[in-house]
Regions:
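Conserved short loop/turn motifs at secondary-structure junctions
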Residues: 1, 101-104, 181-183, 254-263, ...
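Intrinsically disordered, low-complexity regulatory segments
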Residues: 1-159, 166, 465
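Metal- or metallocofactor-binding catalytic centers and their adjacent structured scaffolds
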Residues: 232-265, 271
Length: 689
């Protein structure tokens, strides 16, 4: 029998249906000479540092850097049962070969291979590589299963990425956490992304707005401008000089311009536009596209290509026709698609651009959740636009000369709306309308025409600061980060991959280093402080972009994985050496993160709230008040934070409701600290006289 392993149960179910594996078992399906099972994402992962040595369970500066010579792997907590199922199936004597049917990409390859290796499996396996979960695509994929060796380098790159993230994350996080006494999460891609947010925020906070003035002259429907005059006095002087004077059309240029259709969606571009049009976060968009993929309504989501292959031309035409029939928004659209414009075999590596599938023909779109309908409309719109006609317009540029000054204006007239007609139809359906540049048409004039008695006016303006990043603009910045450091022949990857960028943004928010305000992403105080204290090799998008390019070269067989990891180990070692200690003031940059309730009666240091106790912050001092202690427990009372604060402040505290076995009723008393400096703190009780 053949064991097929998918990435998640829903995908396994789609595959099992096609293969005829309809008999449900515990953790798998069986039938037709196939057993189909699944992972739940990553079932096996790199082991925690404490698995290598018990002393790593505590975070200590002296233990850094941590760099395993031989890597260990462990089954992900709470997923042990499914790993047990897969391991048992791999060892089943009926199984003679396997099919890796996890997602067709770097992470999917890693998910399967780690389970395969951890289970100690040596049986041969092949690779299912598909871009759609439609029945026809699954059948085609199983008819053309690929040799697993074709993906050894993909696995090598995935494992290298995982190890690099572990080395940078474990060492960077432990280093700066122990130095600053606050958990500071450092990540190979996460940290330079945060640095971009902080840099933008800094530019905004230090921005000094400058005033400038525009002078306008005109007659009737024709107005031209002299922009960015520095002073109001000068602007008013120019306006006064031109008021009621003659203006001559000294220059008139007319040019027909073309705006080519946009490319098809890759994941990042789709996430950007879903954020701009709908306000969806990158993670929300990825989740929605993944759901639609599993419903067989969209092709594979985690792609970085914006093209299709030439053998997909007939399918693309069919899908365009289905989109116009099935999506009510485009029901009136009629186009003659130019498929050649979106076809380029050389620009499709693992997966083609995101498209609707022919399965859309059978779907009642109105029955889908609104959020899924929005994504389908967006992808459908882009397909129609990308294969539509060019948008052409006539642009007119006019210069008016008046009293020695040149005033300019520009207008345009649409010649052929082309693909923009579909985009305008889509934008008109949005609740929040996008502010497009208004199309300004100009009256017909000729060079040399004279305007008599023009009017002149002055308007005041201010320079504007850069805008905070939205997920749209941050994704764009991540995609191009560090690109200027590479030559034109280098394939550039930026920060992260289409599959990981959404998760990186979410980690920044969950770690408390960034927050969302409306559509904007803004660094928090802790986020700004973290970037300030980290060295450039950790915060630099350039270095991380170089790493991403090296990973891509490992995947292509052009770089060595061991050399890549050795370089990262050296970098983290240098990082630890560069931070041997901090001044007391610098160590308090992030605050203690602890609640102080008073001063230690022994040494005067702050006393903090701990887990079940109130302890002196001075490590050389042993003073500690325990919530559950013999004295208070005997009186059926707990030493609360309020009592502890009073004891530290005054040395005594009046406590009510104390218990004694000698009398049936409760009593009140004054409790005093009676500390002699020993291992345990003593108390003394006094009664009212």
């Amino acid at each position: 029998m053949i064991l097929v392993i998918a990435e998640k149960p829903s995908v396994a179910q789609s595959i099992a249906k096609v293969l005829g594996a309809t008999s449900r078992k515990d953790g798998y399906m069986e039938g037709g000479n196939y057993i189909v099972s699944w992972c739940f994402g990553h079932l096996v992962e790199l082991a925690d540092a404490s698995s290598y040595d018990e002393r790593y369970a505590k975070w200590r500066y002296d233990d850094l850097p941590i760099a395993p010579e031989s890597w260990m792997f462990e089954v992900t907590k709470n997923k042990a049962q499914q790993f047990k199922v897969l391991s048992s199936l791999m060892k089943d004597k009926r199984v003679t070969e396997l099919v890796c049917a996890t997602d067709a990409g770097r992470e999917g390859e890693l998910i399967f291979r780690l389970v395969y290796d951890k289970a100690g499996c040596t049986k041969p396996f092949k690779r299912l590589w598909i871009s759609s979960l439609e029945d026809s695509a699954i059948r085609e994929g199983f008819n053309h299963l690929r040799d697993s060796k074709e993906y050894d380098r993909l696995y090598e790159a995935a494992l290298s990425r995982s190890k690099a993230d572990w080395i940078v994350g474990i060492n960077g996080t432990r280093l700066f956490t122990t130095l600053y006494h606050k958990k500071l999460v450092v990540g190979r891609v996460q940290t330079p992304t945060l640095a971009m947010l902080v840099e933008r925020d800094g530019k905004i906070s230090t921005f000094q707005k400058e005033k400038y003035f525009n002078v306008h002259v005109g007659e009737g429907d024709l107005t031209a401008d002299l922009e960015k005059v520095k002073t109001e006095e000068e602007a008013k002087r120019i306006a006064a000089a031109c008021e009621k004077k003659q203006a001559v059309v000294s220059s008139l240029k007319q040019e027909t311009k073309t705006v080519n259709p946009p490319k098809l969606y890759d994941l990042t571009t789709l996430q950007r536009e879903a954020n701009r049009y709908y306000g969806f976060t990158a993670q929300q968009t990825l989740d929605l596209v993944q759901t639609l993929y599993e419903k067989k309504l969209l092709t594979y989501p985690r792609t970085d290509s914006q093209f299709i292959t030439d053998d997909m031309e007939d399918t693309a035409r069919q899908v365009i026709s289905i989109v116009c029939r099935q999506l009510p928004l485009f029901s009136g659209v009629s186009i003659t698609p130019d498929i050649a414009r979106v076809t380029d075999n050389s620009k499709v590596t693992d997966h083609h651009a995101i498209l609707p599938t022919v399965q859309l023909e059978k779907q009642d779109v109105s029955a889908l959740p609104q959020s899924e309908q929005k994504i389908l409309n967006l992808v459908g719109m882009r397909l129609l636009c990308a294969t539509g006609e060019k948008h052409t317009y006539a642009e007119t540029q006019i210069t008016l000369s008046c009293e020695g000054y040149a005033f300019k204006t520009k207008g345009k007239t649409v010649v052929q709306n082309g693909w923009k007609a579909v985009e305008e139809l889509f934008k008109a359906s949005l609740k929040t309308k996008e502010k497009d540049d208004p199309v300004k048409s100009l009256p017909e004039v000729h060079e040399g025409d004279v305007l008599d008695g023009v009017s002149a006016s002055v308007t005041e303006h201010f320079t504007t600061p850069p805008k905070q990043y939205t997920e749209d603009t941050l994704l764009s910045a991540m995609e191009t980060a560090g690109n200027d450091q590479f030559d034109d022949d280098t394939e550039k990857k930026g920060l992260g991959t289409p599959a990981t960028r959404a998760g990186i943004i979410e980690k920044l928010v969950k770690s408390g280093f960034a927050e969302r305000k409306g559509k904007s992403l803004i660094p928090t105080k802790d986020g700004c402080n973290l970037v300030c204290v980290l060295p450039e090799q950790i915060t630099s998008p350039k270095m991380t972009a170089e790493w991403e390019n090296t990973l891509m070269e490992i995947e292509r067989g052009k770089a060595d994985a061991d050399a890549f990891l050795s370089g990262i180990v050296r970098m983290t070692g240098d990082l630890v050496k560069a931070y041997p200690f901090l001044s007391d003031a610098e160590a308090q940059r992030f605050g203690t993160g602890k609640e102080e309730i008073g001063k230690c009666p022994r040494c005067g240091s702050p006393v903090y709230v701990g887990k079940g106790n109130f302890y002196c912050s001075n490590k050389e001092c042993s003073f500690c008040l325990w919530e559950e202690n013999k004295f208070f427990s005997s009186k059926k009372k707990k030493l609360t934070k309020k009592i502890a604060k009073e004891l530290l402040d005054k040395g005594w505290c009046r406590v009510t409701g104390l218990y004694t076995p000698k009398k049936p009723q409760l009593y009140d008393a004054v409790i005093r600290l009676d500390d002699s400096g020993g291992k345990y703190v003593s108390f003394k009780m006094e009664f009212d006289r």
